[in-house]
């Protein structure tokens, strides 16, 4: 049985997550390290986490950084016939991807599942029934964006007051303030 289903995202005050295939804000090294640590760390000996992303998100990662190392990389696409070079798996939908994690080739290898973008994949995950956590980095200013994070339904999602391994105080890099939040739903 695969562990928890999670989304991880950094989002500006105006809910932006991307611009021209890149992040809308300058690179924030410690925020990126947080993403690496959260998506890579497995709590189960001998297992790896699975990162699920849409095709655009995959191609927005610099080629030298693909696949995201130390993680099993799965790309979602209805157009592609085989996984893009470097990706480990391809699925047509999030449901198909989650079914794949129950197959023998992955069931014993995958610990946590992390959804890393983009908008439509986040939306599909957030509307998925069952237990889901959202790891949201709130970038505390507006940035011009062309890609946005879906609205978080606070009827369904509860902001957790604290979470192990997640700093609760405001961070600052390059004059940009941000904070880490964790939301959880169980329906």
UniProtKB/Swiss-Prot annotation:
Superkingdom per UniProt: Eukaryota
Residue intervals passing through the bilayer: none
Record's subcellular location: Mitochondrion; Cytoplasm
Mutagenesis or variant effect for residue 36 to E: Reduces catalytic rate 2-fold. Reduces affinity for dihydrofolate 9-fold
Outcome of mutating residue 65 to S: Increases affinity for dihydrofolate about 15-fold. No effect on affinity for NADPH
Tissue note: Widely expressed in fetal and adult tissues, including throughout the fetal and adult brains and whole blood. Expression is higher in the adult brain than in the fetal brain.
EC main group: oxidoreductase
Gene Ontology BP annotations: axon regeneration; dihydrofolate metabolic process; folic acid metabolic process; negative regulation of translation; one-carbon metabolic process; regulation of removal of superoxide radicals; response to methotrexate; tetrahydrobiopterin biosynthetic process
Functional pathway: Cofactor biosynthesis; tetrahydrofolate biosynthesis; 5,6,7,8-tetrahydrofolate from 7,8-dihydrofolate: step 1/1
GO molecular-function term, one example from the UniProt record: mRNA regulatory element binding translation repressor activity
EC number(s) reported in the record: 1.5.1.3
GO CC terms, sorted: cytosol; mitochondrion
Record: residues binding NADP(+): 10, 16-22, 55-57, 77-79, 117-124
Key word RNA-binding present: yes
Catalytic reaction list: (6S)-5,6,7,8-tetrahydrofolate + NADP(+) = 7,8-dihydrofolate + NADPH + H(+)
Assembly behavior: Homodimer.
Cited function: Key enzyme in folate metabolism. Contributes to the de novo mitochondrial thymidylate biosynthesis pathway. Catalyzes an essential reaction for de novo glycine and purine synthesis, and for DNA precursor synthesis. Binds its own mRNA and that of DHFR2.
Known disease link: Megaloblastic anemia due to dihydrofolate reductase deficiency: An inborn error of metabolism, characterized by megaloblastic anemia and/or pancytopenia, severe cerebral folate deficiency, and cerebral tetrahydrobiopterin deficiency. Clinical features include variable neurologic symptoms, ranging from severe developmental delay and generalized seizures in infancy, to childhood absence epilepsy with learning difficulties, to lack of symptoms.
Designated name of the protein: Dihydrofolate reductase
Source species: Homo sapiens
Top-level taxonomy: Eukaryota, Metazoa, Chordata, Craniata, Vertebrata
